[in-house]
């Protein structure tokens, strides 16, 4: 059966009714759960299997029976490993029913249906005697995330030891260690705080108010593939230090909240702005089988791994790739200036049941440092990438060049469309007679109002809807300006909402009004990802176990719930270009309502496996041939077939993953259909063999 659901269309800005199957939410959860990513993590799989073999063999040698509990079994892969390693009994629990049903079929397909007791419950709901005949003496689980404890591992382990495990139970993993490294990074700092906006001569146009400068920001992690952060963009100020240990095996309760004050020493002068964070796990009791999530420069096996990898693979990519356990950046509330190498300071580390936070101070704090939150609206309103985008110098200069060349003091009247458009506010500082900002979002508007007040801008008016602008005001406009950026946008072309807003008032604007951007172009680039394609690639088998039933389940769900193009920050996921970029859509905002139906072929110029197509938008600020009139959301440097692509680090690009990625092709057929009045933009891509 099917039902109708209200869905916001980002291009039209309106809710529309879409017919969807009753189980659409289930399919969406299955398709986006990330199980496949974990199953492609060869190091995780091999080391879990090795730890099970080693631990079960040692328990056997000690004369013990082995009764295994697998919490959050997923596909059942760890349960099957435990059986293969010689466990006497295995109980697996999985609360996500679609996954539990799939696990049941996978266990049967691998001959383990009658050997694994599958419980469709959370582990915290399991009762001994009712669900399990006895307590387990070996727990195997994967309950961790990038932050280690963000999925509730502390509470789950505490409950398991209290209710489900014997006094002498062992755990895989046995323990975890968390690490921090204090660093300075002008680039990463742009993701956290708002800088002054200056004109092309470097003179300030807009200054952030005191409430922004004094805000401590959000304590939450910024999860990134830290190995992909260019080495020239940061300076480690300390060596990595161990900050917390979590003993998953001990019977005593794991504390839900701890504070750790470490006296550390700088290895060079700089500003202690942020903390790089990662963890490792010792999978066996003896600590011999180690899995590290460290970035490449701190990875304990970097020399061994770099010797095994091909010479054409960049050093940051020799460490095992995974997207479910990344690294994180935590921003220090008030950066600490370290004036010399060898300077001692205090790193304050804290965790509660689900999260961590940090501070750095010259003197030891007198009491525990509370978890900080945003008090300025910036961090609670915008994503990290958007905050960075607002600070992005090269991008801002192109917009400011247009504004400085076109805004006439005491003559220009400007309408700004978008959310949080500081560049639009800059037109007021440049002398525009009036500036009207379309800003319907409550917190974004409050932030901009504070900037207007602090910079004493007298000619700025906010409007909730473009329809509220009086006809006489529209008729007197000299400029309509946008970046464009809208809070509801996920994919780059979702910001075509600018065209929708413009179309509502176009007939009331003077003929000579200047509209910027005047047009937008979408480009497509066939690429070969090193790893990102694995999040959608079939698993087939894992450590000798047949997982094709899992692939079929995910494929069915993906067909119903996954868009053909998804948003990804491609700077974190290296890929080689297989051709030059090709334009697949050009939208003229003066004729936005026109439909487009296009198709073509991209010839591949470099041999490789096309396992992805990257897509992005170039905004044309003014209709001329200067490259400085283009603001791109795609590559930050010219693309060369066969070379790695360098991507804009402050926006997400679109990615299409072909269904078949294991064959060499000579060209890629594409088609684009754009119906702006309906807000429908779709792409198709078809591979052509040589």
Curated annotation (Swiss-Prot):
Is the Methyltransferase keyword given for this protein? yes
GO annotation, biological process: peptidyl-arginine methylation
Looking at the keywords, is Secreted present?
A: no
**Classification via Pfam families:** PrmA, PRMT_C
Its keywords, alphabetically, are:
Methyltransferase, Repeat, S-adenosyl-L-methionine, Transferase
What are its E.C. numbers? 2.1.1.-
Q: What class of enzyme is it?
A: transferase
Where's the SAM-dependent MTase PRMT-type domain? 14-357, 366-690
Show the PROSITE patterns listed in the entry: SAM_MT_PRMT
Q: Name one GO molecular function term.
A: protein-arginine omega-N symmetric methyltransferase activity
User: Organism's domain of life?
Assistant: Eukaryota
Q: Which InterPro entries match?
A: Arg_MeTrfase (IPR025799), MeTrfase_PRMT7 (IPR014644), PRMT_dom (IPR055135), SAM-dependent_MTases_sf (IPR029063)
According to its UniProt entry, what is the function of this protein?
A: Essential arginine methyltransferase that can both catalyze the formation of omega-N monomethylarginine (MMA) and symmetrical dimethylarginine (sDMA). Specifically mediates the symmetrical dimethylation of arginine residues in the small nuclear ribonucleoproteins SmD1 and SmD3.
| Recorded family membership | Belongs to the class I-like SAM-binding methyltransferase superfamily. Protein arginine N-methyltransferase family. PRMT7 subfamily.
Protein's name according to its UniProt entry:
Protein arginine N-methyltransferase 7
- Which taxonomic lineage is given here? Eukaryota, Metazoa, Ecdysozoa, Arthropoda, Hexapoda
Q: Which gene encodes it?
A: Art7
């Amino acid at each position: 059966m099917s039902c109708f659901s209200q869905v916001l269309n980002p291009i039209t800005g309106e809710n529309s009714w879409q017919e969807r199957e009753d189980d659409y939410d289930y399919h969406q959860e299955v398709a986006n759960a990330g199980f496949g990513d974990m199953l492609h993590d060869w190091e995780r799989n091999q080391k879990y299997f090795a730890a099970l073999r080693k631990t079960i063999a040692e328990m056997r040698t000690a004369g013990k029976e082995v009764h295994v509990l697998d919490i959050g079994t997923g596909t059942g892969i760890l349960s099957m490993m435990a059986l293969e390693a010689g466990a006497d009994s295995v109980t697996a629990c999985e609360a996500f029913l679609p996954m539990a049903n799939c696990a049941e079929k996978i266990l049967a397909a691998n001959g383990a249906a009658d050997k694994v007791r599958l419980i469709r419950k959370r582990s915290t709901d399991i009762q001994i005697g009712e669900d399990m005949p006895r307590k387990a003496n070996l727990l195997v689980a994967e309950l961790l995330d990038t932050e280690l404890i963000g999925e509730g591992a502390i509470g789950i382990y505490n409950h398991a030891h209290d209710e489900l495990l014997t006094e002498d139970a062992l755990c895989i993993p046995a323990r975890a260690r968390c690490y921090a490294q204090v660093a300075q990074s002008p680039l990463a700092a742009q993701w956290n705080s708002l800088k002054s906006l200056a004109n092309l001569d470097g003179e300030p146009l807009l200054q952030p108010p005191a409430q922004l400068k004094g805000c401590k920001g959000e304590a939450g992690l910024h999860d990134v593939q830290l190995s992909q952060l260019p080495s020239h963009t940061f300076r480690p100020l300390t060596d990595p230090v161990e900050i917390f240990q979590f003993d998953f095996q001990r019977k005593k309760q794991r504390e839900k909240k701890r504070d750790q004050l470490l006296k550390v020493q700088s290895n060079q002068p700089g500003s202690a702005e942020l903390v790089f964070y990662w963890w490792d796990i010792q999978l066996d009791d003896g600590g011999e089988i180690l899995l590290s999530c460290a970035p490449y420069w701190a990875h304990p096996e970097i020399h061994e791994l770099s010797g095994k990898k091909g010479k054409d693979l960049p050093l940051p990519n020799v460490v095992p790739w995974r997207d479910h356990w990344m690294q994180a950046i935590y921003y220090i509330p008030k950066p600490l200036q370290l004036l010399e190498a060898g300077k001692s300071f205090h790193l304050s580390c804290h965790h509660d049941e689900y999260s961590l936070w940090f501070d750095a101070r010259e003197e030891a704090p007198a009491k525990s440092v509370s978890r900080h939150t945003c008090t300025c609206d910036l961090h609670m309103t915008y994503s990290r990438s958007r905050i960075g985008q607002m600070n992005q110098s090269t991008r801002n200069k192109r917009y400011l060049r247009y504004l400085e060349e076109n805004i006439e003091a005491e003559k220009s009247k400007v309408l700004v469309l978008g959310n949080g458009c500081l560049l639009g506010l800059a037109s007021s500082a440049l002398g525009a007679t009036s500036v009207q900002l379309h800003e319907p979002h409550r917190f974004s508007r409050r932030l901009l109002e504070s900037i207007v007040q602090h910079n004493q801008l007298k000619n700025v008016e906010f409007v909730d809807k473009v329809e509220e602008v009086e006809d006489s005001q529209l008729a007197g406009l000299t400029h309509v300006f946008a970046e464009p950026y809208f809070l509801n946008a996920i994919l780059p072309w979702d910001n075509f909402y600018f065209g929708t807003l413009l179309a509502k008032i176009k007939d009331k604007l003077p003929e000579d009004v200047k509209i910027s951007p005047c047009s937008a172009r979408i480009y497509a680039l066939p690429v070969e990802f090193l790893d990102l394609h694995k999040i959608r690639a079939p698993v087939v088998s894992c450590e000798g176990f047949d997982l094709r039933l899992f692939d079929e389940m995910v494929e069915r769900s993906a067909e119903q719930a996954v868009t053909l193009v998804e948003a990804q920050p491609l700077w974190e996921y290296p890929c080689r270009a297989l051709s030059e970029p090709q334009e697949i859509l050009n939208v003229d905002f003066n004729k936005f309502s026109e439909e487009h139906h296009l198709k073509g072929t991209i010839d591949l110029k470099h041999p490789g496996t096309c396992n992805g197509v990257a897509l992005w938008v170039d905004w044309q600020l003014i209709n001329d041939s200067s490259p400085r009139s283009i603001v791109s959301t795609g590559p930050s440097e010219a693309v060369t077939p066969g070379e790695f692509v360098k991507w804009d680090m402050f926006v997400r690009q679109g990615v299409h993953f072909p269904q078949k990625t294991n064959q060499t092709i000579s060209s890629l057929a594409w088609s684009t259909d754009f119906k702006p009045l309906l807000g429908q933009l779709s792409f198709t891509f078809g591979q052509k063999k040589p």
